[in-house]
Amino acid sequence: MKTLLLTLVVVTIVCLDLGYTLKCNKLVPLFYKTCPAGKNLCYKMFMVSNLTVPVKRGCIDVCPKNSALVKYVCCNTDRCN
């Protein structure tokens, strides 16, 4: 009985992600990556001249400020970029 209980506890720990990890889209949204510790935001970078096509996506720790040439959109849920 103790062995069964221990097995269930181990399976639960393995199945549950005890340390939450954020998943962000790569440039092609069909693919994503798991962000490393400390990178708690997903971002999407656009050139101001063409705001419909993102040029870069990924994980980041702090959302960069927009500039005259580049716009950033940041979010904090899985695959939100």
From Swiss-Prot:
GO terms for molecular function: toxin activity. One of its GO terms (cellular component) is membrane. Keywords: Cardiotoxin, Cytolysis, Disulfide bond, Hemolysis, Membrane, Secreted, Signal, Target cell membrane, Target membrane, Toxin. It is found in: Secreted; Target cell membrane. Expressed by the venom gland. It comes from the Eukaryota. CDD domains: TFP_snake_toxin. Residues 1-21 form the signal peptide. GO terms for biological process: killing of cells of another organism. Belongs to the three-finger toxin family. Short-chain subfamily. Type IA cytotoxin sub-subfamily. Basic protein that binds to cell membrane and depolarizes cardiomyocytes. It also shows lytic activities, but 2-fold less important than that of CTX-A4. It binds to the integrin alpha-V/beta-3 (ITGAV/ITGB3) with a moderate affinity. It may interact with sulfatides in the cell membrane which induces pore formation and cell internalization and is responsible for cytotoxicity in cardiomyocytes. It may also target the mitochondrial membrane and induce mitochondrial swelling and fragmentation. Monomer in solution; Homodimer and oligomer in the presence of negatively charged lipids forming a pore with a size ranging between 20 and 30 Angstroms. This is Cytotoxin 2. It comes from Naja atra (Chinese cobra).
